From Swiss-Prot:
It comes from Drosophila melanogaster (Fruit fly). SUPFAM superfamilies: HSP20-like chaperones. This is Heat shock protein 23. Residues 53-161 form the sHSP domain. One of its GO terms (cellular component) is cytoplasm.
Length: 186
């Protein structure tokens, strides 16, 4: 299964290869390229297989984004009952797990299980993760945008206390008090 993207890429590359000059129309190139007769059917089969694998994963169509309201993930989990889903926070990630035991469907028996992990963006608090499940099977996970941090450095405003009249000169300590502070007793 891990080779499917590689094979699709190879099929695309072979489809673009041509043994005729670039100035001929594309349809002429397709007719003269001997590899295309082999690649066409293989490419169709690989695309069908990719669709089947994506559809059976249980959580296809998951979309995550960071918007003006914060971080949000939406995923289709319509193949699962609410009791078969678990959303949990682990460190700075949100884990979504869906699991249902073997059951019968239109094509036979099926078991589904998936685990998705979403790393929270820097600054987003894992304690504020919330999830909702719509009636049509769309699971939405939201984390509110963190408050903007204003960088003021070490600046702070010092309150001014109002007092009675003051003299502009600084009072000096009496000479004896200064000598006692220095440890010289007379």
């Amino acid at each position: 299964m891990a080779n499917i993207p590689l094979l699709l890429s190879l099929a695309d590359d072979l489809g673009r290869m041509s043994m005729v000059p670039f100035y001929e129309p594309y349809y002429c190139q397709r007719q003269r390229n001997p590899y295309l007769a082999l690649v066409g059917p293989m490419e169709q089969q690989l695309r069908q297989l990719e669709k089947q694998v994506g559809a059976s994963s249980g959580s296809s169509g998951a979309v995550s984004k960071i918007g003006k309201d914060g971080f949000q993930v939406c995923m289709d989990v319509s193949h699962f009952k609410p009791s078969e889903l678990v959303v949990k926070v682990q460190d700075n990630s949100v884990l979504v797990e869906g699991n249902h035991e073997e059951r019968e469907d239109d094509h036979g028996f099926i078991t589904r299980h998936f685990v998705r992990r979403y790393a929270l963006p820097p600054g987003y608090e894992a304690d504020k993760v919330a999830s909702t499940l719509s009636s049509d099977g769309v699971l939405t996970i939201k984390v509110p945008k963190p408050p903007a941090i204003e960088d003021k450095g070490n600046e702070r405003i010092v309150q001014i206390q109002q007092v009675g009249p003051a003299h502009l000169n600084v009072k000096e300590n009496p000479k004896e008090a200064v000598e006692q502070d220095n440890g010289n007793d007379k």
